[in-house]
């Protein structure tokens, strides 16, 4: 490779070869594990990072426009058809150079960086929606990413964040979601839990998930509202939904459990609720 020169890739991509890990063109990808890469912190860089071919493809299909791509020869070649017309530079480097830039070895071999874009309101993301996931206190990025992946695969139309939730665009959340955090519409409630009342006034039935023994069993509760617009409320692992959220909900629902187990991982519980919704007749469309 010749450092800093543009080269014609055998598959037709115009790439810029980089051999120096200190090259300032790669600053958007530098030290990805550093605390200042946390975009949810006051001093954090507010960039969205996609890792791996599939997640980069989903970024390219989303509202997030890449500033640059950085990858190995092999992985950039896999993206050849997706990159037509993308007005961003492609930086090519060895796996060794990539590791020195980002701070760890990346098996997936390619990254894309994008700026954040303005977020829609709750009213905008739920307009026309039939099934909405409402999260409160879900502060683990991996759980959040898994919920987005489950939502995408099980026909959830939008996600609404209440208080105390993690950042859906943090790198780990985007990676675990397989890029679906970039595609599934979401919004943050400006006034919590008052926004739950707004959902009710918009015609949604609020089903609050809780392990309490006096709650309705999930399959029966979902079946009873199969023709209605529903919002599935999911709380933090451990404390669950707050008393205020439970009070506003229309129905409290629980997953029937066995062997003395009182609850499941929050992403697993959400997936079961989403699946019950599809099983009750809510349409599963073609995958992304």
Swiss-Prot record:
Listed GO biological process terms: methylation; RNA processing
Gene3D superfamilies in UniProt: 3.40.1280.10
GO function terms (MF aspect): RNA binding; RNA methyltransferase activity
Basic and acidic residues bias (residue ranges): 1-12
Matches recorded under SUPFAM superfamilies: alpha/beta knot (SSF75217), L30e-like (SSF55315)
Family of this protein: Belongs to the class IV-like SAM-binding methyltransferase superfamily. RNA methyltransferase TrmH family.
Annotated protein name in UniProt: Uncharacterized tRNA/rRNA methyltransferase Mb0905
Lineage of origin: Bacteria, Bacillati, Actinomycetota, Actinomycetes, Mycobacteriales
């Amino acid at each position: 490779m010749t450092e800093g020169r543009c080269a014609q890739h055998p598959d037709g991509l115009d790439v810029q070869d980089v051999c120096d890990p200190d090259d300032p063109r790669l600053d958007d990808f530098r030290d990805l594990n550093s605390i200042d890469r946390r975009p949810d912190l006051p001093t954090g860089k507010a960039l969205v990072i996609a890792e791996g071919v599939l997640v980069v493809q989903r970024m390219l299909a989303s509202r997030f426009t890449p500033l640059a791509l950085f990858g190995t020869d092999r992985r950039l070649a896999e993206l050849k058809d997706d990159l037509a017309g993308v007005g961003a530079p492609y930086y090519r480097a060895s796996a060794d150079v990539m590791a020195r830039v980002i701070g760890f070895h990346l098996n997936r071999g390619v990254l894309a960086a994008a700026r954040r874009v303005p977020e829609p309101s709750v009213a905008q993301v739920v307009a026309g929606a039939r099934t909405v996931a409402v999260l409160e206190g879900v502060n683990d990025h991996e759980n959040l990413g898994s919920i987005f992946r489950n939502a995408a695969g099980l026909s959830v139309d939008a996600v609404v964040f209440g208080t105390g939730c993690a950042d859906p665009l943090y790198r780990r959340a985007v990676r675990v979601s397989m890029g679906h955090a970039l595609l599934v519409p979401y919004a943050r409630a400006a006034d919590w839990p008052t926004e739950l009342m707004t959902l009710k006034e918009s015609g949604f039935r609020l089903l609050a998930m809780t392990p309490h023994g006096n709650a309705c069993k999930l399959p029966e509760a979902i079946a009873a509202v199969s023709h209605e617009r529903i919002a599935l409320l999911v709380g933090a692992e451990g404390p669950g939904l707050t008393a205020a959220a439970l009070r506003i909900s229309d129905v409290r629902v629980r997953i029937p459990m066995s062997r003395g187990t009182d609850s499941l991982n929050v992403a697993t519980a959400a997936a079961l609720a989403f699946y019950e919704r599809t099983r009750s007749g809510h349409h599963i469309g073609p995958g992304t």
